[in-house]
Amino acid sequence: MNSVGVVKPQTLHFAEPLTLECNRTLPSFELIIETYGTLNSDKSNAVLICHALSGSHHAAGFHSDNDKKAGWWDNMIGPNKSIDTNRFFVVCVNNIGSCFGSTGPTSINPESSKAQVYGPDFPLVTIKDWVKTQAMLSDRLEIDVWHAVVGGSMGGMQALQWAADYPSRLKRCVVIASTPKLSAQNIAFNEVARQSILSDPDFKNGRYLQAGTYPRRGLILARMVGHITYLTDDAMKAKFGRDLKSGKFMYGYDVEFQVESYLRYQGERFSENFDANTYLLMTKALDYFDPTRDYPLTQSAQPIDSLVPEELLASSLVESVKADSSEDELAKTLADSADIDNISASNHQELTALKAAFAHTECQYLIVSFTTDWRFAPERSQEIVDALMATGKPVSYINVDAPHGHDSFLFDIPRYMGAVKGFLNAPFMTDNQSKNSQQKLGARS
């Protein structure tokens, strides 16, 4: 119902060399895309969809009349849906490095002597590289300015990078369940996932296709680890609890709990459709993402007293040190105070760097977070909002109450879907209107 129907992917070849951030060059590359809706005469109704880690170009519709699995964002894209294909021309592109048709590790390396796949020789790519190829795609489609660039999770990072790198080429930026950069904890999760693949004996240093093997066990474990971070404790408790698959303990290492069965199923299904080398480079692209890297503010530490108001430093320290404090107590208090000041300084520097990264952007923003998302918590979205507001950018923010954790951005949640639709359909604000329109939709919670 309200589907875009059967869609046919298109493959576009780019003959020009592509220099990547890692200083390596692809001699040529291909991008596979899907489009939905009709581009209007002045090409002002185009919306770009950026996919997440395991996503692809197939965001909506079906590949045949018998296809039972719709695109990964079919509840968002279609006639009269949040991204209305009666109104917009929607483009979803599969990024290079993926395993769903665009040039990646499973593609033939044109520089190999025996027409072998790239495998581990495919260069590491970044969010910035992806956005660069998407801009090249825009040129090929003769779309000068996108009505909006939209993405969830890693797709949201691409939308942010678009705003920073091509400020005049998009009017709206929709960032959903995302973050300005990965935390140490998130990098750690990615490293555990990578090591599960790298340590699989069938990985063969990434040349498993040539060896006729496949690191299936490693990829299964990697997906199991990742999937846990997409869910919430409450959701897992409600769905599985401590339910046993057979109703009794089997006193062995086979699947006993329902949650074990679920995770293994998710891992096995993923391993059948995804490439291990692609998983490795996708997670590294996540780790590398940091739109503030191009700004020296992130490298220059400022004195604490220039970041925290003098009266705050004085009052907080004096009030916490009593006249009869022992030398040890005094030392501890001073140390605790220094820790607090260091945190304040760090937060200030992060905000300053983000402000610098987005100060030159020209688009309007919608930032969406979900209350139960602990992979990219609402606080991370609020960092983006704070930086945008501090630079006077027009930004709307909504923190949606949803039980699905990080995966909430894939669910049909009325308040969330309504916010996206309203934002995309609203008239573009002039500069004068923008100055008076900074708003946050929904309370911070």
Swiss-Prot record:
The lineage of its organism: Bacteria, Pseudomonadati, Pseudomonadota, Gammaproteobacteria, Moraxellales. It holds the Pfam family Abhydrolase_1. It is an enzyme of class 2 (transferase). It comes from the Bacteria. The keyword Cell division does not apply. Transfers a succinyl group from succinyl-CoA to L-homoserine, forming succinyl-L-homoserine. Pathway: Amino-acid biosynthesis; L-methionine biosynthesis via de novo pathway; O-succinyl-L-homoserine from L-homoserine: step 1/1. PANTHER family: HOMOSERINE O-ACETYLTRANSFERASE. Substrate binds at R223, D407. This is Homoserine O-succinyltransferase. The keyword Transferase applies. Its EC number is 2.3.1.46. Belongs to the AB hydrolase superfamily. MetX family. Homodimer. Residues 45-411 form the AB hydrolase-1 domain. It is found in: Cytoplasm. The record marks R375 as: Important for acyl-CoA specificity. Its main location: cytoplasm. One of its GO terms (molecular function) is homoserine O-acetyltransferase activity. HAMAP family: MetX_acyltransf (MF_00296). It catalyses: L-homoserine + succinyl-CoA = O-succinyl-L-homoserine + CoA. Keywords: Acyltransferase, Amino-acid biosynthesis, Cytoplasm, Methionine biosynthesis, Transferase. InterPro entries: AB_hydrolase_1, AB_hydrolase_fold, HAT_MetX-like. One of its GO terms (cellular component) is cytoplasm. GO terms for biological process: homoserine metabolic process; methionine biosynthetic process. The active site is at S153 (nucleophile), D373, H406.
